[in-house]
Amino acid sequence: MKVMQVIPKLGYGGAETGCYDLAHYLPENNCQSYIITSGGPLLKYIKKDKVKLFRLPVHSKNPLLIILNSIFISFIILFFNISIVHARSRAPAWSCLLATKFTRRKFVTTFHGTYNFNNSI
């Protein structure tokens, strides 16, 4: 199984730490791990021999960049044959939703905090 996580920045928060932990847990359990992020301080700790890393401006809420990101994410999904896409924030969730609709892959998203539960994502 190939799992790609998409997170705006790899800082030191809860979602970021969860992304880092899952990214390093997956290869130990016969899964391949991929991360798309725009950067962040945790990048230097990613074990690049275990996790494939891509840099895209997925932190942006600009509608044009969301569409462009979805195109790039679609190509990554198809080229690496990604099984599951996990978005860890609202901005990249829109790009991932479009990409997974186009590529017909599984899509999951998580959030923590107070958001409107009537949202389609």
Briefly describe each language-model feature range.
Residues 1-121:
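Membrane-interface segments of envelope glycosyltransferases acting on lipid-linked substrates or membrane lipids
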